[in-house]
Structures are given as C-alpha cells and as structure tokens.
C-alpha cells in the first residue's frame, strides 16, 4: 500500500513539472514588474526573492490575475501606463482604451477648465474635416516632449496591426474619452474657456476674464490663447498662459450676449461680484471683478445701513486708484446695459457666493494700483 502511494505521488509530481504556460502568458510579465516598481504603495512591501528554478513564477501573467485585481491595477495606471498595457494583447487593449479609465484622467487634469461649451466644441471638432488621425505620430507635430512621444509611440504599436489602418478611427471611437484626452494633450484641439488678466496682464485688462480658444503646449505645460476680434481689431494671440489663469466659463453663453442678472435685488454692501463690460457695442464682453459699496449718503454703519433698499447700487473696482474714473460706477437694480462710448458699457452681474471663485480673483490682484 505504501509503495503504491509513493508511486502515485512521484507520478503526479513529474507530470506537473512537465506542464508549462502557453507562450502568450509571458507577454505581460514585464508589465507586472512595471506596475510594482511604479506603485509607491507596493514599494513599501518587503521584496521576496524568487526561486530561479520555478518556471511558474517566471511565466506569471497579468491576465492570470482576478478581474477585480486587474481592474484595480489599470485604474492606478497613468495614461502612459495604460498605453503600455494596451500593447500586450487584444484583451488588454480593449480594457485599456475603455472610457471609464480615461474619463478619470480627463476629469483629473482637464475637468476644471472644460465647460459645456468645450464639450460642444469637441463634438463639432470630431465631426469636422479637420479631425484627421491618419497616424498617431501626426498628432505630435514637433512636440518632442518625452512623455507625449512615449505615449504616442505606445499607441502606434497598439494599432499597428490594423491592415486598413486609418488612425484610431478603425479601432477607437472618435468620441471616446481617450481620443479627447490625446487631442487635448497634443494641442490639436482648441477648446473654449476664459483667461484671467489677458494679454500677459496688460494694464487694460487687470482683474478681468475674457473668452478665448486655448491650445495646450506640452513643451512648457502652458497654453496658447486666441482671443476673438474686438471690432476691427484682429484676433489677439497670447502664449505662455498658465493653468491658474484659466477657468471654464461660468455662464454658458456667447460673450456678445448680455447676461440676465438674477441677483440684483439682493445685492448689498460687501458683496463680491463680476460684471460684464465692453468698450463698445462691437466688442465682446469680458467679466470684471468688483465689490458692492455703500452709497455716499450712508455712513457705513451696518446697524443703520439701508443701501440694500435703494434702487441704486454702487460698484467699486479697487484695482484702480481713488479718483480714477474706473474706480466707481453706479447701476440701477433694474439694470440691463448702461454706459457710453467713452466709459464703455456695463452689462450683466454675477454675485459671487463661492469662496473659491473669490480667492481666484484675489490671486490675480495686480502688484500695484492702476491709474
């Protein structure tokens, strides 16, 4: 009986030693190493020396992981890591180009400066003749930035097996989150947003925010801004616009349209506001930061102040020196658009209730008072 048991065990042992994983299983071995090296959490774990005589460990594949574990790994990868993973096999490629992974990267990097207008512009962009992705390298132009080059090269390998290759169109939906991310990252997609202190902080635009079309420059991690024409004045272009000077438009409307204010009746001294202003009727509106102040007839004592009951509202722009014609203006609570060709035209008002919005304006305060 004992002899029979020993023979059975030895037979089973030699049989299992003769088994090996199929060749495709080792394709992703290096990707596991990439993940464990790049993941700072995994670096805190004690490294275990593998037995070189064990072929099972050497041939371990990422595809052998449970679904949940694999999803967690992919969810932690940066865009370049997802592209590397997508090169391994068709199964991983399908996972790595999925919207749920790239939507997170879109939201994290671009979410704060992409508004409804940018999403509409993206839909127009992908349906236009300018959206050509005949080659992943065509997106890079002369970028030369190592991260983007690496990312695009990875994508080139992902789709190189397509015989009828027409860029991503044959394998990746044009409206996918991955396509949007790459078009933004490579600067091919110009999206609408607003820029604080336009034209490099030109004195005539201090504490203002104007609509523009923006393109990302991966060399400098800044943007190029293209402002709409002001009357007969040609479109202005500004380079080197930093992330902190950009915001998504708070009002989803054309800069030529008057904003219908819904907070005029509740304005009181001390409120922070943005007001539309334009030099003349041919120009688009910009948004300007200001404060609501007390009437001249009021001593400023909050216990006796009745300014909030008056039909006249005093607006103050403290970036201008006392006595400047731009320092103060008065509007009516039934205000629509007021002004003239000399002082410009004041349009709609937004009351700022968000502390983050107010703090953003204060961060762009000029170094010195303007005349």
Swiss-Prot record:
PROSITE patterns for the chain: FBOX
Q: What InterPro entries does its record include?
A: F-box-like_dom_sf, F-box_dom
Stretches of the chain forming a coiled coil according to its record: none
Going by the entry's taxonomy, the superkingdom of the source organism is recorded as Eukaryota
Pfam families per the UniProt record, alphabetical? F-box-like (PF12937)
- Looking at the record, the residues that make up the F-box domain are 59-105
This chain belongs to which protein, by name? Answer: F-box protein At2g32560
